[in-house]
Amino acid sequence: MNSEYEDAYVHKFYSKYAKKFDVTRYKTWPKISSFLKVYDKPGFLNLDAGCGNGRNLPRTGGVWIGLDYSKELLNCIVDKYCKVNDQKDLDCGTLSKKNICKSELKYSLVHKSSSTPHVSFNLIRGDCLCLPFNSNTFDIILSIAVIHHFSTPERRTQALQEMHRVLKPTGRILLYVWNEETKFQSKFKQIKNKDYLVRFKTFDRYYYLYDHKELVDACVKNGFNVEESGIEQESIFVILKKQI
């Protein structure tokens, strides 16, 4: 496998089907809600790394930044939370002024407004393999169904290492990947070993399917303690903290 699979079977998929995919992803899973209820606090700075259509973004508590590679999915977020009469509330700026970014970085800021009083977060188009933030920046990181889209062991490792780098020593990560046990469903087509294509409409998406031990071992190898793990929504989740 190589990164060309991601271009052909991940990026092109989300570019073509962003709006159709958006309407299928609208609920926050129970474990995500309970995790944030415990760990998210006012004054925290948090990252949704691979935020997709933003279903986990509108929250009380800390300040949230949503990062995704797909500009089409980011536009879905803007379309949902910035109504026509609230377009003035969509602004641009540079997060380097907030002393969290490594360089000048443009972003979109969705403010609270009359039609979306509960919404206030930043949106950035970026790559989870090279997060554009300073080290030890975030109190919470969400990585929900993201790293299984990276098509080589090296790239999946790099994604874990980048989250480790930008997480504060006291921070937590909630990470989900699809469970290998789902491979028996008819929508899965094996390429080889644990590499699969999954049909949505008329287009295939690429996934690497983890088993529980493999995910836990990968997290520990890359500098994390696994505080909790389990299964939810056909996925494996882990709650991570940096090893001391």
From Swiss-Prot:
GO terms for biological process: tRNA methylation; tRNA wobble uridine modification. GO terms for cellular component: cytoplasm; nucleus. It is an enzyme of class 2 (transferase). GO terms for molecular function: S-adenosylmethionine-dependent methyltransferase activity; tRNA (5-carboxymethyluridine(34)-5-O)-methyltransferase activity; tRNA binding. SUPFAM superfamilies: S-adenosyl-L-methionine-dependent methyltransferases (SSF53335). Keywords: Methyltransferase, Transferase. It comes from the Eukaryota. InterPro entries: AlkB_tRNA_MeTrf/Diox, Methyltransf_11, SAM-dependent_MTases_sf. The keyword Ribosomal protein does not apply. Pfam families: Methyltransf_11. Its EC number is 2.1.1.-. Belongs to the methyltransferase superfamily. This is Putative methyltransferase NCER_101265. It comes from Vairimorpha ceranae (strain BRL01) (Microsporidian parasite). The lineage of its organism: Eukaryota, Fungi, Fungi incertae sedis, Microsporidia, Nosematidae.
